[in-house]
């Protein structure tokens, strides 16, 4: 076809056979990418430490989506929850990856078939012999099938009736595992953090889709509505489909960034709002106070804090800390976490406990400031030492550790105390291996940040695509300016012969 590069899809407008082929090829590419990406991630994934080196720290993107649907084991015998020597059966990470690659190959062959055999009897009206598609009925068929799939996913896969269930965890991301989930039909089903609502809504939406699909298959639209919404134009289908996709992209960008039952922090990392609101810090303090109230010492109380919970309370795991143009996983930034040093408690020479002011999410650098329980500044690391009144040396600041590697140890020399204070502005203090990955010390975002950014951007682009194609189909007669005297084949295909089309006029050799 003699068309400019930005008009490539024009060839599909009046060609349902090759439109099917294009969609099959696109799905083949998506499935092939998913399977290939899964194999690549499996080749680079280190499952040895699910607490301090989880998949989201390693930049895994497709593995968390498999895990939340119930795939947690590998044919190599490991599980993302830390078990070894397991037998996951066929539906392991590798099994799902291979299934996608095989599906991709079959879809590729189907696309080739439909590209060659594009002029099927199926696409012609049996009464007139003219090319015709019953788009409202096709909409009903697609809606019915989508509803069936949606209902089946909710009623069987998620409930465990015929499937594994879904990833369910506690509010602090400590005890997650794949479990069958019962539907929640009450008001609590609208809580975005309640997995029962996911099940109930898939079942309900599936039933609605099945009923609506049957309605559109059996009932014809009124002629006035058919003409007003251009229901006979394939570009109407494109426009409304893009609308559905961009709406879904906006929704999932929101559920990923703000958090929900479908984006557990064990698989995708914490949200930025959990750092902003001191979510994990408050839970840690609550547990410590409860232990102290029951008679435990400070060392015992802090030693009872799970390392996993302490690791969440570290700014390097905040997805808002990574710039959009800093490529690579989180581990390429601050390094691979090795151990929790313990909770640092600072005191001045009077024995008064001091609290390090933590860095807000969008700061790249932040001063080291220590305050008392009332928020009054008591110590800092000054920029101009000559004018200093609150230096660590002047205030006699010391640091004691409770829990972790340094449990029970106290440091009094100012250089050491200051080094720990600088780390304490980032939350709990951890030891990192920066050698293995040649980590550069610049924070990266988690897959949560990448997913949100990508889907928000594509949703915006697709929104404009919806407006563009919607306008084209509503005002087609104005935009096209097609001369009504042109022959039908010239309108459909231009002046260029379509390969295999015997009806197109062409010059014969003299």
From Swiss-Prot:
Pfam families membership: PSII
Gene3D superfamilies for the chain: Photosystem II CP47 reaction center protein
One GO term of the biological process aspect: photosynthetic electron transport in photosystem II
UniProt topological domain (Cytoplasmic) ranges: 2-16, 117-134, 219-233, 474-510
Chain ranges on the Lumenal side, renumbered to this chain: 38-94, 158-196, 255-450
Quaternary structure note: PSII is composed of 1 copy each of membrane proteins PsbA, PsbB, PsbC, PsbD, PsbE, PsbF, PsbH, PsbI, PsbJ, PsbK, PsbL, PsbM, PsbT, PsbX, PsbY, PsbZ, Psb30/Ycf12, peripheral proteins PsbO, CyanoQ (PsbQ), PsbU, PsbV and a large number of cofactors. It forms dimeric complexes. Part of a photosystem II (PSII) assembly intermediate complex PSII-I; crystallized from a strain deleted of psbJ, it forms monomeric PSII before addition of the oxygen evolving complex. PSII-I includes 3 assembly factors not found in mature PSII (Psb27, Psb28 and Psb34).
Keywords: Chlorophyll, Chromophore, Membrane, Photosynthesis, Photosystem II, Thylakoid, Transmembrane, Transmembrane helix
Subcellular location: Cellular thylakoid membrane
A GO term, aspect molecular function: chlorophyll binding
Protein name: Photosystem II CP47 reaction center protein
Membrane topology type: Multi-pass membrane protein
A single GO cellular-component term on record: plasma membrane-derived thylakoid membrane
Bilayer-crossing regions: 17-37, 95-116, 135-157, 197-218, 234-254, 451-473
Family in the record: Belongs to the PsbB/PsbC family. PsbB subfamily.
The organism's place on the tree of life at top rank: Bacteria
Cofactor note: Binds multiple chlorophylls. PSII binds additional chlorophylls, carotenoids and specific lipids.
Annotated function: One of the components of the core complex of photosystem II (PSII). It binds chlorophyll and helps catalyze the primary light-induced photochemical processes of PSII. PSII is a light-driven water:plastoquinone oxidoreductase, using light energy to abstract electrons from H(2)O, generating O(2) and a proton gradient subsequently used for ATP formation.
């Amino acid at each position: 076809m003699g068309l400019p590069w930005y008009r490539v899809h024009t060839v599909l407008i009046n060609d349902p056979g090759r439109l099917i082929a294009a969609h099959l090829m696109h799905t083949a590419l998506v499935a092939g990418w998913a399977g290939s990406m899964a194999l690549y991630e499996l080749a680079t994934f280190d499952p040895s430490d699910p607490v301090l080196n989880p998949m989201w720290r390693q930049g895994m993107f497709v593995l968390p989506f498999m895990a939340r649907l119930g795939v947690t084991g590998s044919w190599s015998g490991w599980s993302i929850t830390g078990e070894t020597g397991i037998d996951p059966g066929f539906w392991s990470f590798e099994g799902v990856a291979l299934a996608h690659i095989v599906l991709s190959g079959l879809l590729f062959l189907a696309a080739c078939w439909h590209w060659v055999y594009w002029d099927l009897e199926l696409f012609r009206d049996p009464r007139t012999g003219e090319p015709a598609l019953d788009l409202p009925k096709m909409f009903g068929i697609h809606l019915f099938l989508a509803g069936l799939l949606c209902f089946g996913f909710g009623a069987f896969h998620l409930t465990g009736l015929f499937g594994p269930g879904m990833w369910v965890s506690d509010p602090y991301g400590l005890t997650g595992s794949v479990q069958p989930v019962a539907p929640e039909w009450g008001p609590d089903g609208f809580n975005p953090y309640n997995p029962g609502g996911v099940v109930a809504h898939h079942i309900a939406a599936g039933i609605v889709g099945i009923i609506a699909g049957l309605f559109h298959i059996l009932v014809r639209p009124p002629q006035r509505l058919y003409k007003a919404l251009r229901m006979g134009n394939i570009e109407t289908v494109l426009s409304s489909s893009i609308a559905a996709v961009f709406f879904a992209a906006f929704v999932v960008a929101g559920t990923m960034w703000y958090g929900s039952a479908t984006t557990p922090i064990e698989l995708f990392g914490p949200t930025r709002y959990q750092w902003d609101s001191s979510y994990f810090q408050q839970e840690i303090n609550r547990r410590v106070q409860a232990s102290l109230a029951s008679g435990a010492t400070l060392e015992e109380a802090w030693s009872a804090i799970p390392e996993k919970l302490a690791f969440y309370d570290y700014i390097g795991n905040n997805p808002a800390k990574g710039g959009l143009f800093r490529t690579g996983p989180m581990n390429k930034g601050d390094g691979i976490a090795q151990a929790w040093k313990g909770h640092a408690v600072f005191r001045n020479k009077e024995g008064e406990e001091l609290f390090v002011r933590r860095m807000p999410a969008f700061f790249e650098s932040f001063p080291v400031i220590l305050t008392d329980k009332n928020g009054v500044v008591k110590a800092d690391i000054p920029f101009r030492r000559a004018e200093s009144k609150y230096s660590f040396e002047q205030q006699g600041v010391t640091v004691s550790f409770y829990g972790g590697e340094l449990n029970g140890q106290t440091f009094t020399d100012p250089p050491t105390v200051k080094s720990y204070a600088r780390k304490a502005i980032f939350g709990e203090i951890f030891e990192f291996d920066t050698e293995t990955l040649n980590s550069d010390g610049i924070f990266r975002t988690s897959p949560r940040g990448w997913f949100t950014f990508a889907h928000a951007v594509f949703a915006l682009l697709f929104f404009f695509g919806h407006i563009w194609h919607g306008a084209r189909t509503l005002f087609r007669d104005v935009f096209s300016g097609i001369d009504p005297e042109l022959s039908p084949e010239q309108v459909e295909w231009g002046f260029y012969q379509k390969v295999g089309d015997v009806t197109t006029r062409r010059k014969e050799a003299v």
